[in-house]
């Protein structure tokens, strides 16, 4: 008996260590993707004034659209590959490829090279979300995923928050050359790729531990689903399908601010300068650190693992914030603009992380978590194309009117699913739920 308890204790300690390690390295990996993702949005400020590389706003918008289209294709594709080959292979390849593409963009300033590299960046960066969410799902049980993924989802808010001023400082304060936005960002991603190689594993079984949740094993002779079969299975799940549509409607606003925030601020407030124009939109991402944590706690603790109520309420508040943003900019008050950016960050990043992370994993089940998450994020990435295109072709008033309408529609779509819970959901276990180690509970 003592030997059995000792084995359980060692197993629990090992699992806890790996859970912390996986949480940290996957958090860093996705945050790192934002350095190469935000490099072009910062470089736009210098490119617009560089006579040797003439790109107008519409051309920049077209490049963003190329990137986002490739990103959308990758989201649909890499989720299936993560299920088939594991997170390690898919995400590590994405990190290395993204860094290489950024190095090329910082070295060769021609439109054909930029166009090709934006496509490569889209495909490379889209390896991250579905694979890393699957990685987290493998190490954490259903009852705790809401708050765990809520905390973990701060990675992309933090990544965007740090990446933009970092690239702006390197490009316009350290070197006065927009190319450094790409080169410095590539260096960060390469460093994280090295850490990922040494510290990441795809699932507990890869380090000799049992799965955190016991699931019925498929028959030994069951055929392995192909790519199209896995996607069709996701499409037949009404929860996953509605999540995909809602994410399609939500994503344009976020990406317009991410990709065009510095340009929008600089055009209306040129007196504050390029570095400050790159920093002001960071209020959106500072708030994004809190949004996923708050919505994750709310969904698990207040709504009993129901993901939709917290999303609906947050999206309603986002609708109001988006409607007020243009009047705030017309007032000329920088403090009011920053305050609304902060409010938009809280109310957008929360449902963004919940819809694309915990909800997609829960309703997709662990067997096809990567595929379901990839499908939902692929839908969002198609919507994000509008976020990259619209600010380059239309005035700010029109753009934010569209975003207000899409946020409202997304909230209304989720209302009928208010009481939905994932099939695997159960009350937080005290002595019986979960896999072998979780079933035993923490050794006393």
Regions found by a protein language model. Name each.
Residues 21-55, 257-262, 352:
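Extracytoplasmic
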Residues 40-41, 237-293, 352, 387:
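Extracytoplasmic gate region of multi-pass secondary transporters
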Residues 73-111:
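Conserved MFS/SLC helix-loop-helix module at the cytosolic interface between two early adjacent transmembrane helices
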Residues 96-109, 316-330:
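C-terminal ends and interior cores of transmembrane alpha-helices
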Residues 52, 86, 107-112, 175, ...:
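Helix-breaking motifs and short loop linkers at transmembrane-helix boundaries and internal kinks
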Residues 84-95, 301-315:
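Cytoplasmic membrane-interface "Motif A"-like loop-to-helix N-cap segments
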Residues 152-204:
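Helix-loop-helix hairpin linking two adjacent transmembrane segments in secondary transporters
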Residues 117-157:
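Cytoplasmic helix-loop-helix junction between adjacent transmembrane helices
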């Amino acid at each position: 008996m003592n030997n059995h308890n000792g084995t359980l204790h060692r197993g629990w300690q090992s699992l806890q260590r790996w859970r912390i390690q996986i949480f940290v390295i996957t958090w860093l990996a996705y945050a790192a993707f934002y350095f190469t993702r935000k490099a072009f949005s910062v470089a736009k400020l210098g490119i617009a004034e560089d006579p040797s590389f003439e790109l107008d706003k519409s051309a920049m918008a077209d490049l963003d659209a190329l990137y986002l289209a490739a990103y959308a294709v990758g989201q649909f594709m890499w989720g299936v590959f993560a299920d088939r080959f594991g997170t390690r292979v898919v995400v590590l390849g994405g990190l290395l490829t993204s860094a290489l593409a950024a190095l090329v963009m910082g070295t060769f300033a021609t439109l054909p090279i930029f166009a090709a590299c934006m496509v490569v960046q889209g495909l490379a960066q889209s390896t991250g979300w579905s694979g890393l969410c699957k990685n987290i799902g493998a190490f954490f049980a259903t009852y705790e995923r809401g708050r765990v993924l809520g905390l973990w989802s701060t990675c992309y808010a933090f990544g965007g928050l740090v990446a933009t001023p970092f690239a702006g400082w390197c490009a316009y304060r350290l070197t006065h050359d927009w190319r450094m936005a790409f080169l410095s960002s590539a260096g960060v991603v390469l460093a994280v790729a090295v850490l990922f190689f040494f510290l990441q594993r795809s699932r507990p079984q890869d380090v000799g531990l049992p799965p955190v949740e016991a699931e019925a094993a498929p028959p030994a002779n069951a055929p392995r689903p192909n790519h199209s079969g896995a996607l069709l299975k996701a499409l037949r799940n009404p929860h996953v399908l509605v999540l995909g549509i809602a994410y399609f409607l939500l994503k344009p606003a976020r990406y317009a601010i991410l990709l065009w925030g510095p340009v929008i601020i600089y055009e209306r407030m040129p007196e504050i300068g390029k570095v400050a124009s790159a920093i002001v939109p960071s209020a959106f991402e500072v708030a994004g650190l809190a949004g996923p944590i708050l919505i994750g706690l709310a969904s698990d603790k207040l709504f009993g693992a129901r993901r939709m109520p917290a999303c609906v309420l947050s999206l309603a508040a986002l609708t109001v914030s988006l409607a007020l943003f243009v009047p705030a900019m017309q007032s000329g008050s920088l403090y009011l603009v920053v305050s609304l950016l902060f409010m938009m960050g809280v109310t957008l990043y929360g449902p963004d992380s919940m819809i694309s992370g915990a909800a997609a994993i829960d309703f997709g089940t662990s067997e096809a978590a990567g595929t379901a998450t990839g499908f939902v994020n692929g839908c969002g990435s198609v919507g994000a194309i509008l976020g990259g295109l619209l600010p380059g072709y239309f005035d700010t008033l029109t753009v934010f009117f569209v975003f207000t309408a899409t946020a409202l529609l997304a909230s209304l779509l989720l209302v009928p699913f208010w009481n939905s819970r994932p099939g695997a959901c159960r009350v937080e276990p005290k002595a019986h739920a979960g896999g072998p180690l979780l079933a035993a509970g923490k050794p006393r």
